[in-house]
Amino acid sequence: MTVRPDIAGQDTPTTVENADITVVGGGGHVGIPLVLAFAEAGLRVNVNDLNQQSLDALKSGRLPFIEYGATDVLAKALANNRLVFSNGSDRISAGGPIVITIGTPVDEFLNPVRKVVQDCIDAMLPSLSDGQLLVLRSTVFPGTTDWLASYLATKGRKLKVAFCPERVVQGFGLKELREMPQIVSGATPQAERDAAALFEQITPEVVVVSPIEAEFAKLFNNAYRYIEFAATNEFYLIAKSAGVDYQRVLMAMKRNYPRAQSIPRPGFAAGPCLVKDTMQLIAFARNQFGLGHAALLVNEGLVLHVIDDLKHRFDLGTMAVGLLGMAFKADIDDVRASLSYKFKKVLSGQARAVYCTDPFVTTDPDLMPLGEVVAMSDLLILCTPHTAYRHADLNGKPVVDIWGHLEGANVIR
């Protein structure tokens, strides 16, 4: 690929036919930062997505979810005619690379579902040309990249298949694409070279490895992070069982001690990636990934431990409880796989009433303003440590904070 600075401020609109690159799932959490990064680099981008609501938002210059620093980049891309929006597998550009932000989800038996990728490829095949670069971007089960290359060969198609995993943090994808190395792999040497050339346009460094190494790198990164959360959560539970404030222990561990700086705070560790990717490794290892199993038990079980502790401290059946924060992490609006909702479900069978609030989430009609939740609740639980809660007026109500986010006489660790 060649960077296209010549089209800055171009009068000719980008079309499906003249786009330099197509991002399938371009209206999603993985796709939008990538779309904007390529547009910022001067490419004409076909933003392909089945979610018409997301496409309509982007067309109007609005982001469908929080992506910090992206609004101005989107406005510039629209003003410079860098983007075209398409819906459906028959609207894939026949020239230029195709980046697919659809991975292998986990089914109800905790097994990866490769058929999702296969169905996506099958739907697009009539629109693709031999020689095109096909890049898998989302997490896939180990072996999927080479499997896809073989699968396409059995169909008589000569496409270059690559796997270049996304590895950015939610809400800061565009920023991290500019700053962090991108892992690149290809099923053939030519696919590898083309994928590296593509991503060199938007990132300071590419790290070239084999497909299976890239697939493991993505899964290992996320599973390791999930295990880190499990370790600190178990430390929290051990300290609590001894009547010790874990936040003070954590402060002592980390104070000017470099080797402890990566230890995270305890809290509800979840989200759409960490749990799923750990499950993928468990499935790949034929259920022999002991640390992964243990991490799931600790992180998912933390909700039950907190509720059990509340039952010993309070007469929950007579109390209204307010949950502060429903997103899966701080200062974003994404509720996918958020443990706040597990907490709500379990607590609803224990407390007289449960009320929920979140300053960022707009997709849940049951959420209430913070002031109303505080006024109606006898007890508050900090589920997500949004920055805004640090200085919120909680009317002196008792608030359970396992994160160590709040200060005050009313805070219960």
Q: Where are the regions that the model predicts?
A:
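Structural/interface elements that position substrates and couple domains in central-metabolism enzymes
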Residues: 2-413
